[in-house]
Amino acid sequence: MKTLTLAHHGLGRRAHAFYVLTKPRVNALIVFCAVIGMFLAVPDGLPDPLRVFAATVGIACVAGAAAAMNCLIEQQLDARMARTRNRPLPRGELHSVEVLVFAGVLGGFGLSVLYQAVNALTMWLTLATFVGYAVIYTLLLKPRTPQNIVIGGASGAMPPVLGWAAVSGEVTAEALLLFLIIFAWTPPHFWSLALYRTADYARAGLPMLPVTHGAAYTRLSVLLYTCALFGVTLLPFAIRMSGWIYLVAAVTLGLRFVHYAWRLLRDYSDALARRTFRFSIVYLSLLFAALLADHYLRL
């Protein structure tokens, strides 16, 4: 009985380790934005629930596979950083081959679901997003250029486009505008994190902006990109994609984000950078929730 209990406990720990590899909190935001895209793609009424379910499962699986590949590729870097040294691979809880197989099976399953139950366009776009994050960003951009977040942000901005394509079978200007919002949001979001983790990134040898250009330059960049983001978020109202509910939310949230960025520039502290980073996640979630609310409660 004791042996069975220990075996069950060990199996549970390994299952949890694989779960952690998928970066579930990041994945949740990805899926959330994708699902919002699915609902916004339908002018009137609701999208087909089975298609929404299949697309959600497929996108979540491929996103989890991309996260696992990122952990696999960066395991030596993760071991040198306080923020990531407790991930399963640096701790020795899993082997590289296991993670590679896990990512392949999970990603292959997700792509198969998208192709069979959604449409080919969504499958190909999701595959391109996987390659963009796991290969282009992780292998080529992140270790080589301080603009890694800016360029690599394209893959992270894809979820609403994937959701839109899943339901409509096409990529429209409105879908690309959702892409643009997340693309503009990505630099201030990640640079806020990099500001209070500068020593970590320097220790790992990663050329994040605060490491290569200094904290002052990065804080100014956060402010400039946040102001640009504010302007971009007004476009859905300007093109009549969204109405007053969204506009009020976008202005309120945007001014708050700009206020955080301004304070970072003028009165920096690690605690403030951490709060800014956390607020940026809340900001994006509420902004997309406002898009959805406005879609069905248009004023």
UniProtKB/Swiss-Prot annotation:
Protein's membrane topology: Multi-pass membrane protein
Family named by the database record: Belongs to the UbiA prenyltransferase family. Protoheme IX farnesyltransferase subfamily.
GO molecular function: protoheme IX farnesyltransferase activity
Keywords from the UniProt entry: Cell inner membrane, Cell membrane, Heme biosynthesis, Membrane, Transferase, Transmembrane, Transmembrane helix
Record-annotated membrane-spanning stretches: 26-46, 53-73, 94-114, 121-141, 149-169, 175-195, 217-239, 243-265, 277-297
Descriptive protein name: Protoheme IX farnesyltransferase
GO-annotated biological processes: heme O biosynthetic process
Keyword Transmembrane listed: yes
Enzyme Commission numbers on file: 2.5.1.141
Native organism taxonomy: Bacteria, Pseudomonadati, Pseudomonadota, Betaproteobacteria, Rhodocyclales
Cross-referenced InterPro entries: Protohaem_IX_farnesylTrfase (IPR006369), UbiA_prenyltransferase (IPR000537), UbiA_prenylTrfase_CS (IPR030470), UbiA_sf (IPR044878)
The protein's role, per its UniProt record: Converts heme B (protoheme IX) to heme O by substitution of the vinyl group on carbon 2 of heme B porphyrin ring with a hydroxyethyl farnesyl side group.
Note: Carbon 2 of the heme B porphyrin ring is defined according to the Fischer nomenclature.
